[in-house]
């Protein structure tokens, strides 16, 4: 029996919606990354994007455990000498709700063209409304 390998044009993608209210950031991010990659499907193939579309609502209500609201830091650099910027999780959630989740999921996906295609299937919204009702997403409980 030959090993099955999925073809990109044969992959069927579902739409799922996750309510992130009072959920822990890392637990949501790891499940989202798993489903974006397609590892929950029996036809998973490492070199083919077999993942589903994921909509995360209420991203502004994500939680972290312990003191990470103040202690977890995100860094970025302008490219100039001494141009490093640092932001805490609390400030990031206040200013850009959902960006912390996007960064967490992006770090869990492969680096390269396949990973970039996977992250495009993630839709994050700070509030409970989203414009994807036409796709009839199924509720996914984490």
Curated annotation (Swiss-Prot):
One Pfam family it belongs to? Ribosomal_L13
Q: Which InterPro entries match?
A: Ribosomal_uL13, Ribosomal_uL13_bac-type, Ribosomal_uL13_sf
What SUPFAM superfamilies does its record include? Ribosomal protein L13 (SSF52161)
**NCBIfam families for the chain:** rplM_bact (TIGR01066)
A single Gene Ontology CC annotation of this entry is: cytosolic large ribosomal subunit
State the source organism's domain of life: Bacteria
Q: Which UniProt keywords apply?
A: Ribonucleoprotein, Ribosomal protein
Its biological function? This protein is one of the early assembly proteins of the 50S ribosomal subunit, although it is not seen to bind rRNA by itself. It is important during the early stages of 50S assembly.
Q: Which GO terms describe its molecular function?
A: mRNA binding; structural constituent of ribosome
What family does the Swiss-Prot or TrEMBL record give for this protein? Belongs to the universal ribosomal protein uL13 family.
Q: Does the keyword Ribonucleoprotein apply?
A: yes
- Identify this protein by name: Large ribosomal subunit protein uL13
- Subunit annotation: Part of the 50S ribosomal subunit.
Q: Which GO terms describe its biological process?
A: negative regulation of translation; translation
């Amino acid at each position: 029996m030959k090993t099955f390998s999925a073809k990109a044009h044969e992959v069927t993608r579902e739409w799922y919606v996750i309510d992130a209210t009072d959920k822990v950031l890392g637990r949501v991010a790891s499940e989202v990354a798993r489903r974006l990659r397609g590892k929950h499907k029996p036809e998973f193939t490492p070199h083919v994007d077999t993942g589903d579309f994921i909509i995360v609502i209420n991203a502004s209500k994500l939680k972290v455990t312990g003191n990470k609201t103040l202690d977890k830091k995100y860094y970025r650099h302008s490219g100039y000498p001494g141009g490093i910027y640092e932001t805490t999780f609390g400030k990031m959630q206040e200013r850009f709700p959902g960006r912390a989740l996007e960064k967490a999921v992006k770090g869990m996906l492969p680096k390269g063209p396949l990973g970039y295609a996977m992250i495009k299937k993630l839709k994050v919204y700070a509030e409970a409304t989203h414009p994807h009702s036409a796709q009839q997403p199924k509720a996914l409980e984490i």
